[in-house]
Amino acid sequence: MYSRSLSALAFTADFPPAAPKFHQRTHRVRLRNLGTTDKKSSHKIKYKKIPRVHQNLKGGFYMKITFIGATHEVTGSCYYLEAAGHKFLVDCGMEQGPDYYENAEIPVALGEIEFVLLTHAHIDHSGNLPAIYAKGFRGPVYATDATSHLCDIMLRDSAHIQMFEAEWRNRKGRRQGKPEFVPAYTMEDAMGVIRNFVGCPYNKMITPAEGISARFIDAGHLLGSASIELTIREEDTEKKIVFSGDIGNTCQPLIKDPEYLHHADYIVMESTYGDRSHGEKPDYVKLLSEIIQETFDRGGNLVIPSFAVGRTQEMLYFIRQIKADGLVYGHDGFKVYVDSPLANEATTIFSEHQYDCFDEEAMELIKKGINPISFPGLKISVTSDDSKSINYDEEPKVIISASGMCDAGRIKHHLKHNLWNEKNTILFVGYQAVGTLGRALIEGAADVKLFGEPVHVAAHICQMPGISGHADVNGLLDWAKAFEEKPQKVFVTHGDDTCLLYTSPS
């Protein structure tokens, strides 16, 4: 039914190659990205023009979709819909990164939005929920149970970051006579919207409003992630629109593979890796065990900068198997420190949702009484004193800490204590964005600055290839080809221009 190219899908969706003209490129990092000009902020906010999709069919059926974010970029997913006499959002994500297209303003008073349907907990899909709460939204947020629980910790963490950055900017700004910088939202806003979450099981139809029903289908991207099948009824007409969310990579550790859907009139589909194949997956357990062995034999530490939610739990899964199979010789009982408050809370939530989210391999371990993400020698650091004490442990050890790109969090302290020593290894297990400390290290920086001080890079720097929570071009097209009848339109989003329009050589 489909050719093997995302450009074909984009064309089917009438998503024109010239679409970048709708946008204004900006190079400013901005916390506040809802509303118009912020009089209290030190700069003005520009918004991109956005395409609106209207479907006015016989029988009185009318639906409008406004693409607020994740158009010609990956972050800031947000879709505003008017249908069956209701106004609502699918996702409400925050823009991330220093070089992006800014989200447009939601074209309605936020108090008029009745509800939000949320695909998953990642901040680029959920991170602006507290911001719309601060501006008047009081409706329910429907998400899977696991997503609701992850958002509880992730939105609170995001609010802490917003407030910390605003305080830091204002300390500098006051000395320069600049006006106060206002954070995107506060902890009170985050807690307010968290209280409005409604947890939903997979595959159960819900009715958030008259004439609108929705179903969450496992997307296999993150614990609790979902594609959303939305059914809209007006008079005698019924239309089905599917939002893919972020489609997961197959054969990920711990969580299930993405489920396919088979019927839709319209599809809104992501394209994060729409221009590339991940290639053959390496044996991660073998590769990681070899890195641990080589590092420990030198008498060094293995430091793993890791995303707190998802990637940290995958690393624990691999290390449990390494320990169980005795793949590291001469270092029995080696310690593994997880030093990230957010990662620790997320790991607890993973364990609480094993029965509805874990895959067959993980469930087989659980049936045998084995926790797939816990093992002897695992040490959880909670307090700052716990974190500091790791540096006094002279035994070779594994340290897993956030943030995954090394720009914030406790990982910076561990890099300061370990980068200078040639016995140690720094292992990157996730994407490193341009401009981050992690990117500088993998590109061979000889010296870096940490806490204002220069640190020489003598440690071994390496990467574990191929780890991704996103489907590649083949996985995306397999997901699209599962639809048994050709939809009326497919809208390709959540990717840069290359990914949107690229024709895969495979």
Name each region found by the language model.
Residues 44-62:
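Short, Lys/Arg-enriched N-terminal segments with co-localized hydrophobic residues
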Residues 291-300, 306-429:
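Hard-cation-handling environments
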Residues 63-109, 114, 151, 227-244, ...:
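Conserved beta-strand hairpin/beta-sheet module of binuclear metal-dependent hydrolase folds
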Residues 99-150, 156, 263, 267:
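Active-site metal-binding motif and surrounding structural segment of the metallo-beta-lactamase
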Residues 158-222, 354-394:
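Metallo-beta-lactamase
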Residues 64, 83, 200-259:
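Catalytic core of the metallo-beta-lactamase
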Residues 113-122, 129, 142-144, 218, ...:
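Active-site neighborhood of phospho(di)ester-bond hydrolases with catalytic His/Asp-centered motifs
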Residues 502-506:
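Conserved small/polar residues in nucleotide/adenosyl-binding loops
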